[in-house]
Amino acid sequence: MAMSELGIQKTSDGTVSRLLNVVESELQAGREKGDPTEKQLQIILEDAPLWQRFKEVTNEMIVTKNGRRMFPVLKISVSGLDPNAMYSLLLDFVPTDSHRWKYVNGEWVPAGKPEVSSHSCVYIHPDSPNFGAHWMKAPISFSKVKLTNKLNGGGQIMLNSLHKYEPQVHIVRVGGAHRMVMNCSFPETQFIAVTAYQNEEITALKIKYNPFAKAFLDAKERNHLKDIPEAVSESQHVAYSHLGGWIFSNPDGVCAAGNANYQYATPLPLSAPHTHHGCEPYPGLRGHRQAPYPSAYMHRNHSPSVNLIESSSNNLQVFSGPDSWTSLSSTPHTSILSVPHTSGPINPGPSPYPCLWTISNSGGGPAGPGPDVHASSPGAFLLGGPAVTSPLSAQAPTSAGVEVLGEPSLTSIAVSTWTAVASHPFSGWGGPGGGGHHSPSSLDS
């Protein structure tokens, strides 16, 4: 029994010794800076260059009802204390002048007498009291100080808005007869208490150097990006094909409605590089489409056949999927699309999708074989209507007037009536008395 008690005592002594060694090693860094006589006591302001930058533009600190923390954070380094003596560190704020301030025309100017302050708030550092070695081992931060404009207790510092203050640090020796060891202040830490930042330069500095302001910065940048309009020159005729958010990277091989002599004023601002499919996703256009297509219009067609979308008005709209656009050539072809002259009236209607072709059968059924329209590839033309309701995707049967030849590079379409649908009127197109064939102009890239 005696042996067991002896073992427990040795274990306890070893634990206490280990803990004391940990405490001693922690305070050793502070002891090296100590002076039992306190004659070499010195206090240094940390981040002095940062404080100086704020002082040059007259620093401001926010005060709120619930209290707001300071930035820059007041941080000091102390040396010359008695390592084995107990000290408490206190912080208060003293007015620097005898008037209040106002921000006028980009600068702070005096604005009358100050408010009478009947209160005196002092902040006690939460590590107080502690050994001198503890205070000297590392910089001392007053990061938990909160500034308020309402006297509500809770250890917050009450300040009057639009008054200038200077922080003061006090070191008090405790453990016996309390006595003041030192008090000091730093002119570069002066600031004006405000309920909202007045100087934009102060706001910029706070955001730049305060790591906790990064969330505010990110939110501000996002809102700024939302406010930026997509600027397009007024001299340009911009016509995008809004097929599921895709734009053509090689649009000069796509047919355009209108007279062969008509050309767009300036090239479309499209990027030069090409992707594998010959078109580039441009999600930014999705939010600007007047009538976005449903997802069914982006059906990917890997076969040489042509997709037909039939609307309630018996108009057939023919276009190919994105994979077929790879066959578009960068040089215009004279045989891209040839349109026969018809004696029927042509009524171009408004459409948010310019430069598209529609095939209509006014007779309500097949009207007999019409002239063939040849394209160099299945995706060499786009056919669309001004309005689409109840889209249904189907493969074009040969009996419907659309003939798909065996050659993948050749598509023949037989129609009875061609109707040009474009957002721009084109002179010399169709009409009674006209003759000959009209080839649509190529879309400039």
From Swiss-Prot:
Record SUPFAM superfamilies: p53-like transcription factors
Pfam family, one: T-box
Cellular-component GO terms for this entry: chromatin; nucleus
Entry's Gene Ontology BP terms: cell fate specification; heart morphogenesis; mesoderm formation; positive regulation of DNA-templated transcription; regulation of transcription by RNA polymerase II
Record has Transcription as a keyword: yes
Keywords: Activator, DNA-binding, Nucleus, Repressor, Transcription, Transcription regulation
Protein localization: Nucleus
InterPro entries with a match to the protein in the record: p53-like_TF_DNA-bd_sf, T-box_DNA-bd, T-box_sf, TF_Brachyury, TF_T-box, TF_T-box_CS
Coiled-coil parts of chain: none
Primary site of residence: nucleus
Entry-linked PROSITE patterns: TBOX_1 (PS01283), TBOX_2 (PS01264), TBOX_3 (PS50252)
GO molecular function, one term: DNA-binding transcription factor activity, RNA polymerase II-specific
Residues annotated to bind DNA: 45-218
Function: Transcriptional regulator involved in developmental processes. Can activate POMC gene expression and repress the alpha glycoprotein subunit and thyroid-stimulating hormone beta promoters.
PANTHER family: T-BOX PROTEIN-RELATED, T-BOX TRANSCRIPTION FACTOR TBX19
Protein name from the UniProt record: T-box transcription factor TBX19
